[in-house]
Each structure stands twice: as structure tokens, then as C-alpha cells.
Amino acid sequence: MASAVPLTMMWEEVTCSICLDPMVEPMSIECGHSFCQECISEVGKEGGSVCPVCRRHFLLQNLRPNRQVANMVDNLRKISQGAKESPHGELCVVHREKIHLFCEEDGKALCWVCSQSQKHRDHPMVPIEEAAQEYQEKLQVALNKLRHKQELAEKLELDIAMKKASWKGKVEAHKLRIHEEFVRQKNFLAEEEQKQLQKLEEEERQQLRTLGDTEARLAQQIQALQELIAELERRRRGSALELLQEVKSVLERSESWNLKELDVASTDLRNVFYVPGIKKMLRTCGVHITLDPQTANPWLILSENRRQVRLANTRQEVPENEERFDSYPMVLGAQRFDSGKVYWEVDVTGKEAWDLGVCRDNVRRKGQFLLNSDTGFWIIWLWNKQKYEAGTCPQTPLHLQVPPNRIGIFLDYEASTVSFYNITDHASLIYTFSECAFAGPLRPFFNPGFNDRGTNSAPLILCPLKTGW
């Protein structure tokens, strides 16, 4: 039978700290402490609404039954009743003598006759109550570790659920963008719209299936963990003999149990969207853009035809005028747009960093400033050779399947949108700024980036466009 000391400790765990009796209909509050239903209800009625143990606030409507504590109370009552009915303890099945010793080497409970046998006589022995207390403590340590691992597993389960929800939200947002893009391209592209939606939905099914499989594997691990925890709890509630039966094997299993690493899918969407014929449609809005030397940073060199820009090795001798950028290697297009639809393309071959887009005509030119839609810049950029971002606030990471050698920029002033296309990848849509607060004329924006020891010396080149169908 379990010794008196561990039983006393277990009774203390299920004692209500309000009435100081074993809990009746145990209820848990938000902080995790449990009390008799009647006791904690009285505390709430008196207007205290704070935990008697930790003084944290709680709400009566959030009380929840603690079945684990209720079961423990019932089991302890049964153990106590069994102890009263069997005062002489367990008897050895071989010698019919009282079992009161524990062989530490063999891990077996013995009577005094067994302890004197040739098999056990030279082994270290301790009283069974002492052994039970020792292994009770070891089981408690093992149980605490497993419960911690269970918490980690449950947190991972919650993370997977959140990723699934995130996937669904992103897919719905992407569907809307696809739909809007096809509407702009008129009804003759309706069939292509459906094809692209089917691709996206297939990606959704695949990713959710992957997350579902991961969730199922996690559920299996959680079930195995719960079964192991239940076995440890059952042993702790049983007699000393039941507790010690194969106890070393159980402890080894609990110590070796670890949550297996799971492959949780990324929530990043793959870029699957492009419209056949989009390049021809965009180029019907093509315009001839040239660079404005009056706005060029002194470290920039413009080509004679003002269609290329690169970073110089030395500062250029240029007038100090108000229009010129003085801190960053930037330059604006000479053209201004305050209505209509316009489109141009820029060659970025060999570049490891660049910024492209449009900005208000009156943006700040001097000193340091942020490049985002709040400050009048609607741009995307590449930095560190592979990091694409949109200049939102905060920045939006962009995931391109094919690195672009040519970027298309489409401005629809009346629709308040600026769209960017990867011409290298079937003119697939990279990003669209919507509901832009233009508030005045806009100008094309260019930044070839810093040279970075010669690795980013290639120029930005405005591409000639063949307009029409």
C-alpha cells in the first residue's frame, strides 16, 4: 500500500484552501487554482472576485469543472478505505508473509523470506514505504516533465491552427486581387480568370492538406503522451506494489519521450498569377519616359539620351538646386502625370539592388527620409540581391518565383492604383498599391542602389516599348 506520507501529500493537493476539506465538485478559475464549487461561488458573491491563493481577479461565469481533481479525490477515498480494510498490507504470493522490503537492485517488493533467499540476500534493501516515497517523488518529477512537453505540444497545435486560419485569409485576399485584375482586363479574360483561381485553390488544398497531415501526426503524439501521463498517474494513485511494478521501465519511457520534429508548412503564397496577353494590353498605355537631370543625386550618371542611370565612382559637378536629391542616389522622370493610365518598363539586368515606382512631384529631396506610401512614394525594391519588398508601412515581403530582369510599372490615376509586373515571368503581377492618396501630379521614380564594391554597377535602363496590339 502507499505510505502515509505520500498519501498525506496527495490529500493536500486536493484540499480546498477555503474550507480546508477535500474538494466537493471542484471548479477551476482563470489562474488555474481549484476550489469547492460552493466555496468559490461564495467568494464571488461577496464581491471579492479574486483568487484566495494568488489574488488574481476572476469571473464567476468562467468557472469550469476540474474532473482531474474530482477523480483524484474519489481515488484517494478508495485507497484510504482499502488501507482500513487491509491493516496487514499485501502478502507475498509465495510465502504468505507481509511484503515490507524493496530490493533496489532488482526493483522488486519482497517479504522477509524472499529477502534472505540466495537471489536477493546480498542486494541492498530498503523499507517498502521508503522506496515508495522515493519513487513517488521520481514519478512526480517525470510527470511534471511530461506535462511541460504536453504544453509545448498544445502550443504547437495552436500554432498550426493559426497557420491554417492565416492560409485561408491570405487565399481569400489573393482571390480578390485576381478577380479585380481580370475585371480590369474586361470580359474576354473571364475564362483565364477561372484557370488562375483553380491554380490558387489547388495550392490551398495542397498546403492545407500538408498542414492537416502535420496536425494529425501531432495529434497522434499528443495521444501517446496523454496515455503515458495517464499510466504514471494511475501508478501514483495505486498501491506501493502497483507503483513499483516495472517502475524503472516506465520512468525510462517517460524520460526518453520527446515531441518529434514536425514540418510546419510556410504561410507564404507562391506567385501563380499571370494573364496571357497582359503585356500587349499594358503596352497600349505605354509612354516614353526620360530622366530629369535636375533631380539626379550628384553621385549619379545619366546617359546622353537620359534613358539610363548608374552610380558613379566620384561625385559629379552639378548645380545645387532645390529639385535635386542630396542624400540618396535617386532621380525622377521628367514627365508628370495627374490623370489617365500610363505604363513603362525598366531593365534591371545584373542589378543586386534597386528601387522603382512613382512618387508625388513635391516629395522631400533633402536629408534623410522614409520611402513609403505615407511619405508619397509608391515603390518596390530589391536589396541584398534576393530580398524583394513593397514600400508599404510596414514593408510587405514579395515572393517572386522568377527573378525579374525587366519590371513593368502601370499607373491608373483615376483608379488610385500603381501595379508592378515581372515581365521576365509572363508579366506576372508582383504587387498593386490600391486606394493611393495621390493628391497632385506624380512622377516616375528611380534608384539604381549603391555600388557595393562594383557588384551593383549595372545601370537601370528605360526600355523602348512597341505600343499597340
UniProtKB/Swiss-Prot annotation:
Pfam families: PRY, SPRY, zf-B_box, zf-C3HC4. It catalyses: S-ubiquitinyl-[E2 ubiquitin-conjugating enzyme]-L-cysteine + [acceptor protein]-L-lysine = [E2 ubiquitin-conjugating enzyme]-L-cysteine + N(6)-ubiquitinyl-[acceptor protein]-L-lysine. SMART domains: BBOX (SM00336), PRY (SM00589), RING (SM00184), SPRY (SM00449). One of its GO terms (cellular component) is autophagosome. Residues 268-467 form the B30.2/SPRY domain. GO terms for biological process: innate immune response; negative regulation of innate immune response; negative regulation of NF-kappaB transcription factor activity; negative regulation of protein deubiquitination; positive regulation of autophagy; positive regulation of cell cycle; positive regulation of protein binding; protein autoubiquitination. GO terms for molecular function: DNA binding; RNA binding; ubiquitin protein ligase activity; ubiquitin-protein transferase activity; zinc ion binding. PANTHER family: E3 UBIQUITIN-PROTEIN LIGASE TRIM. E3 ubiquitin-protein ligase whose activity is dependent on E2 enzymes, UBE2D1, UBE2D2, UBE2E1 and UBE2E2. Forms a ubiquitin ligase complex in cooperation with the E2 UBE2D2 that is used not only for the ubiquitination of USP4 and IKBKB but also for its self-ubiquitination. Component of cullin-RING-based SCF (SKP1-CUL1-F-box protein) E3 ubiquitin-protein ligase complexes such as SCF(SKP2)-like complexes. A TRIM21-containing SCF(SKP2)-like complex is shown to mediate ubiquitination of CDKN1B ('Thr-187' phosphorylated-form), thereby promoting its degradation by the proteasome. This is E3 ubiquitin-protein ligase TRIM21. It comes from Bos taurus (Bovine). The gene is TRIM21.
